[in-house]
Protein backbone atom coordinates (compact mmCIF):
# COMPACT_ATOMS: atom_id res chain seq x y z
CA UNK A 1 0.00 0.00 0.00
CA UNK A 2 1.40 3.45 -0.91
CA UNK A 3 2.56 5.25 2.18
CA UNK A 4 4.08 8.46 0.77
CA UNK A 5 2.02 11.29 2.27
CA UNK A 6 1.83 14.78 0.80
CA UNK A 7 0.34 17.55 2.93
CA UNK A 8 -0.90 20.99 1.85
CA UNK A 9 -3.46 23.46 3.18
CA UNK A 10 -6.03 21.94 0.84
CA UNK A 11 -5.69 18.43 2.21
CA UNK A 12 -3.71 15.20 2.49
CA UNK A 13 -2.71 13.10 -0.51
CA UNK A 14 -1.23 9.64 -0.77
CA UNK A 15 1.61 8.89 -3.14
CA UNK A 16 -0.72 7.20 -5.64
CA UNK A 17 -2.84 10.35 -6.01
CA UNK A 18 -5.64 9.43 -3.62
CA UNK A 19 -6.91 12.12 -1.23
CA UNK A 20 -8.15 11.53 2.32
CA UNK A 21 -11.79 12.26 3.14
CA UNK A 22 -11.45 13.47 6.76
CA UNK A 23 -15.02 12.60 7.74
CA UNK A 24 -15.00 8.99 6.58
CA UNK A 25 -11.22 8.54 6.89
CA UNK A 26 -11.21 6.85 3.50
CA UNK A 27 -8.95 7.51 0.55
CA UNK A 28 -10.60 8.56 -2.70
CA UNK A 29 -9.02 9.17 -6.08
CA UNK A 30 -8.57 12.93 -6.35
CA UNK A 31 -9.57 14.98 -9.38
CA UNK A 32 -6.60 17.29 -8.93
CA UNK A 33 -2.95 16.57 -8.30
CA UNK A 34 -1.35 17.76 -5.05
CA UNK A 35 -0.36 21.44 -5.28
CA UNK A 36 3.25 22.40 -5.80
CA UNK A 37 3.62 23.49 -2.18
CA UNK A 38 2.61 20.05 -0.85
CA UNK A 39 5.34 18.49 1.26
CA UNK A 40 6.11 14.97 2.35
CA UNK A 41 5.20 14.19 5.96
CA UNK A 42 5.25 11.19 8.29
CA UNK A 43 2.03 9.54 9.46
CA UNK A 44 2.15 11.17 12.91
CA UNK A 45 2.33 14.70 11.49
CA UNK A 46 -0.33 13.91 8.91
CA UNK A 47 -2.71 12.54 11.54
CA UNK A 48 -2.11 15.58 13.71
CA UNK A 49 -3.03 17.87 10.81
CA UNK A 50 -6.22 15.92 10.06
CA UNK A 51 -7.26 16.03 13.71
CA UNK A 52 -6.46 19.71 14.24
CA UNK A 53 -7.01 21.45 10.91
CA UNK A 54 -8.52 18.95 8.54
CA UNK A 55 -11.81 18.56 10.45
CA UNK A 56 -11.19 14.84 10.79
CA UNK A 57 -13.12 12.56 13.11
CA UNK A 58 -11.49 12.57 16.53
CA UNK A 59 -11.38 8.82 17.02
CA UNK A 60 -10.05 7.78 20.44
CA UNK A 61 -7.15 5.43 21.08
CA UNK A 62 -6.97 3.40 24.29
CA UNK A 63 -4.15 2.84 26.76
CA UNK A 64 -4.66 -0.36 28.73
CA UNK A 65 -2.69 -1.99 31.52
CA UNK A 66 -2.78 -3.41 35.04
CA UNK A 67 -3.83 -1.85 38.33
CA UNK A 68 -0.56 -3.04 39.89
CA UNK A 69 2.02 -2.16 37.23
CA UNK A 70 5.77 -2.48 37.31
CA UNK A 71 7.88 0.69 37.03
CA UNK A 72 8.46 -0.12 33.33
CA UNK A 73 4.73 -0.40 32.64
CA UNK A 74 4.08 2.88 34.45
CA UNK A 75 6.74 4.64 32.41
CA UNK A 76 5.42 3.19 29.14
CA UNK A 77 1.84 4.19 30.00
CA UNK A 78 2.80 7.79 30.63
CA UNK A 79 5.12 8.02 27.61
CA UNK A 80 2.69 6.46 25.12
CA UNK A 81 -0.20 8.60 26.34
CA UNK A 82 1.94 11.70 26.04
CA UNK A 83 3.03 10.80 22.49
CA UNK A 84 -0.52 10.10 21.32
CA UNK A 85 -1.94 13.22 22.97
CA UNK A 86 0.73 15.37 21.32
CA UNK A 87 -0.49 14.15 17.92
CA UNK A 88 -4.01 15.16 18.94
CA UNK A 89 -5.76 11.87 19.68
CA UNK A 90 -8.35 11.82 22.47
CA UNK A 91 -7.58 8.87 24.74
CA UNK A 92 -9.57 6.24 26.62
CA UNK A 93 -8.53 4.25 29.66
CA UNK A 94 -10.14 2.44 32.58
CA UNK A 95 -10.08 5.68 34.52
CA UNK A 96 -8.76 4.53 37.87
CA UNK A 97 -5.30 3.80 39.31
CA UNK A 98 -2.09 2.07 38.27
CA UNK A 99 -1.28 2.15 34.57
CA UNK A 100 -4.55 3.98 33.95
CA UNK A 101 -3.55 6.87 36.19
CA UNK A 102 -0.07 7.04 34.65
CA UNK A 103 -1.60 7.24 31.17
CA UNK A 104 -4.02 9.92 32.32
CA UNK A 105 -1.17 11.91 33.82
CA UNK A 106 0.89 11.72 30.63
CA UNK A 107 -2.08 12.75 28.52
CA UNK A 108 -3.11 15.79 30.53
CA UNK A 109 0.51 16.93 31.00
CA UNK A 110 0.56 17.94 27.32
CA UNK A 111 -2.99 19.25 27.17
CA UNK A 112 -4.64 16.06 25.92
CA UNK A 113 -8.15 14.78 26.60
CA UNK A 114 -8.52 11.60 28.69
CA UNK A 115 -11.82 9.75 28.89
CA UNK A 116 -12.21 7.29 31.76
CA UNK A 117 -14.55 4.31 31.25
CA UNK A 118 -15.35 3.34 34.84
CA UNK A 119 -16.79 -0.02 35.89
CA UNK A 120 -18.89 1.42 38.73
CA UNK A 121 -21.79 3.87 38.78
CA UNK A 122 -19.76 6.52 40.63
CA UNK A 123 -17.81 8.96 38.46
CA UNK A 124 -15.85 10.09 41.55
CA UNK A 125 -13.80 6.88 41.32
CA UNK A 126 -11.91 8.38 38.39
CA UNK A 127 -8.34 9.49 38.97
CA UNK A 128 -7.66 13.22 39.14
CA UNK A 129 -6.30 13.40 35.58
CA UNK A 130 -9.42 12.10 33.81
CA UNK A 131 -11.24 14.93 32.02
CA UNK A 132 -14.39 12.99 31.13
CA UNK A 133 -15.33 10.23 33.61
CA UNK A 134 -18.02 7.89 32.27
CA UNK A 135 -19.61 5.84 35.05
CA UNK A 136 -20.99 2.76 33.30
CA UNK A 137 -22.21 0.63 36.22
CA UNK A 138 -21.55 -2.50 34.16
CA UNK A 139 -18.54 -3.85 36.03
CA UNK A 140 -15.92 -5.77 34.07
CA UNK A 141 -18.07 -5.58 30.95
CA UNK A 142 -16.64 -2.09 30.55
CA UNK A 143 -13.52 -3.84 29.19
CA UNK A 144 -15.48 -4.62 26.04
CA UNK A 145 -16.62 -1.00 25.83
CA UNK A 146 -13.02 0.24 25.97
CA UNK A 147 -11.87 -2.26 23.35
CA UNK A 148 -14.63 -1.48 20.86
CA UNK A 149 -14.84 2.29 21.41
CA UNK A 150 -11.14 2.73 20.54
CA UNK A 151 -9.85 2.28 16.99
CA UNK A 152 -6.46 1.22 18.40
CA UNK A 153 -5.29 -0.06 21.78
CA UNK A 154 -1.84 0.08 23.34
CA UNK A 155 -1.17 -2.43 26.12
CA UNK A 156 1.63 -1.36 28.44
CA UNK A 157 1.71 -4.33 30.81
CA UNK A 158 -0.12 -7.20 32.44
CA UNK A 159 2.22 -10.08 31.63
CA UNK A 160 4.19 -9.86 34.87
CA UNK A 161 2.84 -11.32 38.11
CA UNK A 162 0.14 -10.74 39.12
CA UNK A 163 -1.09 -11.37 35.59
CA UNK A 164 -3.75 -8.85 34.53
CA UNK A 165 -6.61 -10.85 33.08
CA UNK A 166 -8.55 -7.63 32.64
CA UNK A 167 -5.87 -6.30 30.30
CA UNK A 168 -5.78 -9.61 28.44
CA UNK A 169 -9.56 -9.47 27.98
CA UNK A 170 -9.33 -5.94 26.55
CA UNK A 171 -6.63 -7.04 24.13
CA UNK A 172 -8.68 -10.07 23.09
CA UNK A 173 -11.83 -8.00 22.56
CA UNK A 174 -9.83 -5.54 20.48
CA UNK A 175 -8.37 -8.27 18.29
CA UNK A 176 -11.79 -9.89 17.95
CA UNK A 177 -13.22 -6.64 16.59
CA UNK A 178 -10.37 -5.93 14.20
CA UNK A 179 -8.72 -3.16 16.18
CA UNK A 180 -5.01 -2.48 16.06
CA UNK A 181 -3.59 -3.87 19.32
CA UNK A 182 -0.05 -2.80 20.18
CA UNK A 183 2.02 -4.45 22.89
CA UNK A 184 4.79 -2.65 24.71
CA UNK A 185 7.63 -4.45 26.53
CA UNK A 186 5.55 -6.05 29.31
CA UNK A 187 2.28 -6.58 27.46
CA UNK A 188 0.84 -10.11 27.40
CA UNK A 189 1.68 -12.25 24.38
CA UNK A 190 -1.35 -12.81 22.15
CA UNK A 191 -1.42 -13.73 18.44
CA UNK A 192 -2.04 -10.65 16.34
CA UNK A 193 -0.50 -8.14 18.74
CA UNK A 194 1.95 -5.70 17.11
CA UNK A 195 5.06 -5.25 19.25
CA UNK A 196 6.60 -1.79 19.64
CA UNK A 197 9.83 -0.89 21.40
CA UNK A 198 9.15 2.78 22.09
CA UNK A 199 6.34 5.27 22.63
CA UNK A 200 7.27 7.00 19.37
CA UNK A 201 7.00 3.76 17.41
CA UNK A 202 3.64 3.00 18.99
CA UNK A 203 2.33 6.48 18.20
CA UNK A 204 3.47 6.19 14.58
CA UNK A 205 1.67 2.85 14.25
CA UNK A 206 -1.53 4.31 15.72
CA UNK A 207 -1.31 7.31 13.39
CA UNK A 208 -0.89 5.03 10.37
CA UNK A 209 -3.95 3.01 11.37
CA UNK A 210 -5.96 6.21 11.83
CA UNK A 211 -5.05 7.20 8.27
CA UNK A 212 -5.99 3.73 7.00
CA UNK A 213 -2.42 3.05 5.94
CA UNK A 214 -2.06 -0.27 7.75
PLM regions and their residue ranges:
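Short acidic-hydrophobic, aromatic-tinged amphipathic segments that line or gate anion-handling sites
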Residues: 133-137, 193-212
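Generic structural signal for short, solvent-exposed loop/turn connectors between secondary structure elements
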Residues: 32-38, 69-72, 121-128, 183-198
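Glycine-rich beta-alpha loop segments
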Residues: 3-114
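Amphipathic, non-transmembrane alpha-helical secondary structure
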Residues: 75-78, 82, 101, 144, ...
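Generic secondary-structure signature for well-ordered alpha-helical cores
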Residues: 89, 108-112, 176, 207-212
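Acidic/glycine-enriched connector segments
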Residues: 78-79, 94, 98-177, 183-191
Amino acid sequence: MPDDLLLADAGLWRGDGAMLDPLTLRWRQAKDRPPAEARRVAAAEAAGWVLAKGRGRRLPAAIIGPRDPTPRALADAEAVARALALIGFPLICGGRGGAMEAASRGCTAVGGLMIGILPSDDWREANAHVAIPLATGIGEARNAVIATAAFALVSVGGREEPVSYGTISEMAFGLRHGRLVIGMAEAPDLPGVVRCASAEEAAARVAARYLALG
